[in-house]
């Protein structure tokens, strides 16, 4: 029997229902339904219900995947969720006034928390499979990018995550039912507007409490029904559409009642929890037996210095043991400090407790390679500064690691406390660097951590003041080096203003501070490492502020390049950074050759990123082990200290272009021509091998295109490739006073293009006008005259200057292109003949033939034959040498004749 319609009246008795079924059976038999139609329940749902049900099913799938940490499927489900939400947007805009449903925001928040939890679990991440690890990175990026549009909703949700909307109640009920197929289809998220309607219509549809009628019979309207029933139907169904809609059965209504009861219980619990929170704070009970916090002192104990020190020794004796609660240890030390301050036990005792708190915070993190927690970092900064302020305020407290524990004095002045604030601040500085390395350099977290550098430098300054008052030279050198390492890479614009006279000479700049600190280390340090690092930092700081000559002199006088190979890796990294910055300084000052020499060792290896400790290149198989990679990552520099690698490479390639292109033009036919820059030469050759070259896009392509233009002497095209909007944005605008650098570059391009032009086309001209060259290259006539004179003096250009006519006369002493190629061909043929002769000698040998080994009488004959005609190889070599000498003699005669002709012309002119 078809169950297409449910019974409309639940108040009828069983007997009347059977009569109606009997009377209606014959009429209903006229309608024949297929078996498929009999098994299907007709459900009419709105678009909002469909969209919301799709969203909730995907959210449930995501939660299941999260429980088993199935990250690839979580990623695919998240992509499905975003697509489903995009489809539901029109419905949300229409029904919810554009407000994102709370259950969707809850899903995003839970997903973000799940990703952060998995990402922070380093040990767990290492054990992930390759597919899971890759999917985790992709999912993290996509979620972080996606939730940017929901930041306000997420922040509001996180402020009150326990509040639930009506739509979210449906989701909770759906998940609490156990996940039936029927429940999934009927218990989806319903529209918020439909919920009140369902509540209002419930009394009309609800049956009495003792009504147990079945809902499985078919209610067909017949003529035999009473008028009361028909009138009830008319009141119950306002239109024909409602008459044929699915009606809820008793079982479904019971399920709905259960869900409503559960929701009421949940809301009641939340309300009670909020009321309890208003009464007072609650503590989370840890699973297992509760460990009572140990009492500090007895109730009636007299608290004095020996008792506090004994308690301090008792707390610190558990340091480093296996089952020590390190968090509890820190709390006890803070409590002991408060007790000491309350009973006025003296500043020395307080300093001692402060130092032990610092040690306990350092001990909290057992893995030295990992950074400490942010809460401990903030606590450490606060305690460290508090301790140093106490030491500076009380000059009679002497804190040193040379003080033995039995010689500590807390009763009478001067007070002696065992401890080393220098070691504490050095560890503090190292922890700060670890925190920076751990953060994503492009996130706000990195900026937040970088703001802590102010407090770190302030703490170092406090320690520096303390050791300047009472400290050894070695301790002062160590703390000076820490301050130098926070100062040397920072640019101070006041230095250049002071150079230009815009500031008074008495103004103290960072260069003056560096001079003071470094000179003390040069004079007082007895360890090579501190002095070497101070020199390197000093050179770096000078180079950053364009003090080229001071930086160069320091490099030459210190002989660092001779001893740097024996230094530790951190010092070698600092040396590489210094050379890179020195090369940039030389380039800014117009010393192109020096800039190239400084950068060539870094760039020729192809690994400047690794040499400057700014990242690791993808490794080949078994190139380095996991332990080596871990050590190298620890040596990396923080992101804010990086040198722009693209800027470095551009400066190197431009310097190489300005040196290499004129050299190539001058030695075009020289077979033994050497390469000034191997990297630039390879870039040039690879570009020439390409059959089709498009317009330049990258920085390297711009430099190569400029080099090709310079080879033709076209300085304008060369300058346009080097100095343009794209290159300015990528490279030149990164320089301080970038306009001056661009002007300097254009000037050098003009001069080197002129030199290249003269080298390339000197065999074409008999004479050339200097004013014409000056006009062509937009250079002053004296500058052109100076360039040509220098080329003639260095014997690079065979020409003579005629000052009255302002012309350059070419001597044409160099061979033409055909002659140069012919001479190269002759040299190569001669080399080939020599090689063949050597091979022939090796095959024949210089011993007598095997057939005449026993005939001693023939030895004289063979010797005579060798002397007469057998030595034809030697004769041929002699003949070649004579021909060579004759050619050289002929050339000398030609040179002599040309000189004589010039002398005759000079005499005639006089």
From Swiss-Prot:
Cytoplasm: present as a keyword of the record? yes
Domain PCI: start-end pairs: 639-815
**Which segments show compositional bias classed as Basic and acidic residues?**
240-268
Q: Where is this region: Disordered?
A: 1-21, 157-281, 847-910
Q: Which purpose does this protein serve, as stated in its record? A: Component of the eukaryotic translation initiation factor 3 (eIF-3) complex, which is involved in protein synthesis of a specialized repertoire of mRNAs and, together with other initiation factors, stimulates binding of mRNA and methionyl-tRNAi to the 40S ribosome. The eIF-3 complex specifically targets and initiates translation of a subset of mRNAs involved in cell proliferation.
Report the residues modified as Phosphoserine: 34, 165, 176, 185
Task: Please list the GO terms describing molecular function.
Answer: RNA binding; translation initiation factor activity; translation initiation factor binding
Annotated protein name in UniProt: Eukaryotic translation initiation factor 3 subunit C
Fill in the subunit field for this protein. Component of the eukaryotic translation initiation factor 3 (eIF-3) complex. The eIF-3 complex interacts with pix.
Basic residues: bias regions: 882-891
Show the InterPro entries listed in the entry.
EIF3C, EIF3C_N_dom, PCI_dom, WH_DNA-bd_sf
Does Transport show up as a keyword for this record?
Answer: no
Question: GO CC terms on record?
Answer: eukaryotic 43S preinitiation complex; eukaryotic 48S preinitiation complex; eukaryotic translation initiation factor 3 complex
Q: What does the UniProt keyword field contain?
A: Cytoplasm, Initiation factor, Phosphoprotein, Protein biosynthesis
SMART domains for the chain: PINT
The entry sums up its family as follows: Belongs to the eIF-3 subunit C family.
Q: Which intervals carry biased composition (Acidic residues)? A: 11-20, 162-186, 209-235
> Where in the cell is the protein located?
Cytoplasm
Pfam families of this UniProt entry?
A: eIF-3c_N, PCI
Quote the biased-composition stretches of kind Low complexity, using this chain's numbering. Answer: 193-207, 862-874, 895-910
């Amino acid at each position: 029997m078809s169950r297409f319609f449910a019974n409309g009246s639940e108040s009828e008795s069983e007997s009347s229902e059977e009569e109606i079924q009997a009377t209606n059976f014959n009429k209903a038999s006229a309608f024949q339904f297929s078996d498929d139609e009999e098994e299907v329940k007709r459900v009419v749902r709105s678009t909002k219900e469909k969209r919301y049900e799709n969203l909730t099913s995907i959210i449930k799938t995501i939660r299941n995947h999260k429980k088993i940490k199935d990250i690839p499927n979580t990623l695919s489900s998240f992509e499905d969720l975003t697509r489903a939400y995009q489809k539901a947007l029109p419905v949300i805009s229409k029904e919810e006034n554009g407000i994102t449903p709370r259950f969707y925001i809850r899903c995003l928040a839970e997903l973000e928390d799940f990703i952060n939890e998995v990402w922070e679990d380093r040990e767990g991440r290492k054990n992930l499979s390759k597919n899971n690890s890759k999917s985790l990175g992709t999912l993290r990026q996509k979620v972080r990018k996606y939730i940017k549009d929901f930041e306000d909703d997420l922040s509001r949700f996180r402020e009150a995550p326990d509040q639930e909307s009506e739509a979210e109640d449906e989701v909770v009920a759906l998940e609490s039912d156990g996940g039936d197929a029927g429940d999934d289809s009927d218990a989806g998220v319903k529209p918020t507007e439909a919920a009140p309607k369902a509540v209002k219509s419930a009394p009309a549809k609800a049956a009495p409490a003792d009504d147990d009628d079945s809902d499985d019979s078919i209610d067909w309207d017949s003529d035999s029904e009473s008028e009361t029933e028909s009138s009830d139907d008319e009141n119950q169904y306002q239109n024909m559409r409602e008459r044929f809609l699915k009606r809820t059965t008793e079982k479904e209504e019971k399920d709905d009642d259960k869900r409503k009861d559960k929701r009421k219980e949940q809301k009641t619990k939340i309300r009670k929890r909020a009321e309890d929170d208003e009464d007072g704070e609650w503590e989370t009970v840890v699973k297992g037996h509760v460990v009572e916090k140990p009492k500090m002192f007895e109730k009636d104990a007299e608290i004095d210095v020996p008792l506090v020190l004994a308690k301090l020794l008792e707390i610190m004796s558990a340091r480093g043991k296996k089952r020590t609660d390190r968090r509890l240890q820190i709390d006890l030390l803070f409590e002991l400090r408060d007790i000491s301050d309350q009973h006025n036990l003296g500043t020395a005792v307080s300093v001692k407790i402060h130092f032990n708190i610092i040690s306990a915070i350092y001990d909290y993190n057992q893995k030295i390679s990992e950074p400490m927690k942010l809460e401990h970092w903030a606590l450490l900064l606060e305690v460290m500064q508090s301790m140093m302020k106490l030491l500076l305020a009380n000059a009679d407290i002497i804190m040193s690691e040379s003080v033995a524990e039995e010689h500590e004095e807390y009763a009478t002045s001067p007070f002696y406390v065992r401890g080393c604030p220098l070691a504490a601040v050095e560890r503090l500085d190292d922890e700060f660097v670890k925190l920076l390395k751990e953060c994503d350099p492009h996130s706000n977290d990195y900026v937040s951590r970088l703001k802590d550098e102010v407090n770190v430098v302030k703490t170092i300054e406090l320690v520096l003041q303390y050791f300047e008052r009472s400290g050894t030279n070695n301790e002062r050198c160590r703390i000076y080096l820490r301050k130098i390492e926070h100062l040397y890479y920072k640019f101070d614009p006041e230095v250049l203003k002071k150079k230009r006279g815009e500031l008074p000479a008495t103004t103290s700049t960072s260069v003056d501070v560096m001079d003071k600190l470094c000179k003390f280390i040069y004079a007082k340090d007895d360890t090579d490492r501190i002095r070497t690092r101070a020199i390197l930092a000093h050179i770096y700081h000078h180079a950053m502020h364009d003090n080229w000559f001071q930086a160069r002199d320091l490099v030459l006088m210190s002989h660092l390049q001779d001893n740097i190979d024996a230094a530790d890796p951190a010092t070698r990294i600092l040396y590489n950074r210094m050379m890179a910055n020195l090369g940039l300084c030389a380039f800014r000052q117009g010393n192109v050759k020096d800039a190239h020499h400084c950068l060539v060792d870094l760039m020729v290896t192809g690994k400047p990123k690794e040499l400057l400790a700014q990242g690791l290149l993808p490794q080949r198989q078994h190139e380095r082990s996991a332990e080596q990679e871990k050590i190298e990552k620890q040596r990396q520099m923080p992101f804010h200290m990086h040198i722009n690698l693209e800027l470095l490479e551009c400066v190197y390639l431009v310097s190489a272009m300005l040196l290499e292109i004129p050299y190539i033009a001058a030695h075009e036919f020289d077979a033994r021509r050497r390469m000034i820059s191997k990297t630039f030469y390879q870039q040039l050759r690879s570009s020439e091998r390409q059959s089709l070259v498009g317009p330049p896009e990258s920085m390297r392509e711009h430099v190569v295109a400029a080099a090709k233009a310079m080879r033709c002497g076209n300085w304008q095209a060369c300058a346009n490739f080097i100095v343009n909007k794209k290159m300015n944005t990528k490279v030149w605008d990164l320089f301080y006073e970038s306009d001056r650098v661009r002007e300097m570059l254009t000037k050098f391009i003009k001069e080197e293009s002129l030199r290249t032009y003269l080298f390339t086309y000197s065999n074409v001209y008999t004479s050339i006008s200097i004013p014409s060259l000056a006009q062509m290259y937009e250079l002053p006539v004296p500058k052109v005259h100076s360039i040509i004179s220098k080329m003639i003096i260095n014997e690079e250009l065979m020409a003579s200057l005629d000052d009255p006519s302002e012309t350059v006369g070419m001597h044409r002493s160099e061979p033409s292109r055909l002659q140069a190629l012919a001479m190269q061909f002759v040299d190569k043929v001669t080399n080939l003949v020599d090689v063949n002769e050597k091979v022939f000698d090796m095959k024949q040998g210089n011993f007598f033939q095997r057939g005449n080994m026993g005939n001693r009488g023939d030895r004289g004959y063979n010797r005579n034959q060798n002397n007469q005609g057998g030595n034809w190889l030697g004769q041929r070599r002699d003949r070649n040498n004579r021909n060579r000498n004759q050619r050289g003699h002929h050339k000398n005669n030609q040179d002599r004749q040309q000189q004589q002709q010039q002398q005759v012309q000079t005499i005639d002119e006089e």
